[in-house]
């Protein structure tokens, strides 16, 4: 049986199609020289994974993050190169452990705006903004839904503009991607406030409906993820890709 499932996996899995959040430097963003391609630290990590499992991984731009998740649900993409853990996502994707990166989600506000923030409840009564379909961990997502006033917008650029034009009191977003976009848009007068909203793990996921989702393939990917984690490659990739993103934006 093991042999026949291997043959089946090899027949249906000549390549794997991967995608992710395209507004996510230094992790992922669209290649300025080929807008159908995603580049960044996660994309480079996926190429190392590809070598380990012996199957080419094609990292394509599919659309914004909301659409990406829909495509994963339908099995039109195989892998997501970076997703937070949420219960609803378990219904359509398998997660691989360990996580390949821990990220910090922070509160952004204007430098001249006083936001006395030490805990989540300090945000009650203030107008927040974030990007549609973003999750910041189950606990915060639930709290935000029940207690906070947060507008959802399609892109991080729009959210940062709203914040700098005082149409929102605060923005919730991850620190590294936020810093990358602030640099790109040349916005000044914004700051982050401590403590972080959450420290969240980024995982590799495989769609349940992917033709490549076989026990043999899951085992192969799981082994490779474990090996790459032990080699601690991600920190080096992030440093290099922050530099690459800045260089591209200043052209």
Language-model region placement:
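Periplasmic-binding protein-like
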Residues: 22, 102-106, 183-222, 244-250
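Extracytoplasmic small-molecule ligand-binding "clamshell" domains
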Residues: 10-84, 91
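Extended ligand-binding regions for polar small-molecule ligands
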Residues: 43-52, 113, 134, 206-244
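A ligand-binding cleft/hinge motif common to bilobed small-molecule-binding domains
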Residues: 66, 83-91, 169-199
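Ligand-binding clefts/hinges and TM-proximal coupling segments of bilobed small-molecule sensing domains
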Residues: 56, 135-151, 189, 223-251
């Amino acid at each position: 049986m093991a042999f026949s499932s291997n043959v089946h996996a090899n027949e249906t899995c000549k390549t794997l199609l991967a995608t992710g959040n395209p507004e996510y430097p230094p992790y992922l963003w669209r290649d300025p020289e080929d807008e159908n391609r995603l580049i960044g630290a996660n994309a480079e990590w996926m190429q190392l994974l590809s070598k380990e499992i012996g199957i080419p991984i094609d990292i394509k731009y599919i659309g914004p993050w909301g659409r990406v998740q829909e495509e994963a649900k339908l099995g039109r993409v195989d892998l997501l190169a970076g997703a937070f853990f949420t219960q609803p996502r378990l219904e359509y994707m398998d997660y691989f452990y360990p996580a390949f990166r821990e990220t910090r989600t922070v509160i952004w506000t204007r430098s001249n705006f006083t936001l006395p923030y030490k805990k989540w409840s300090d945000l009650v009564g203030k107008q927040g903004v974030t990007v549609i379909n973003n999750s910041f961990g189950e606990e915060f997502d639930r709290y935000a839904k029940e207690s906070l006033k947060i507008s959802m917008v399609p892109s991080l650029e729009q959210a940062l503009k709203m914040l700098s034009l005082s149409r929102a009191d605060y923005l919730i977003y991850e620190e590294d991607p936020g810093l990358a976009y602030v640099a790109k848009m040349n916005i000044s007068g914004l700051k982050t406030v401590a403590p972080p909203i959450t420290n969240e793990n980024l995982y590799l996921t495989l769609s349940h409906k992917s033709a490549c989702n076989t026990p043999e393939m899951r085992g192969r990917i799981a082994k490779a993820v474990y090996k790459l984690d032990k080699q601690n490659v991600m920190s080096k990739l992030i440093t290099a890709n922050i530099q690459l993103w800045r260089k591209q934006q200043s052209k």
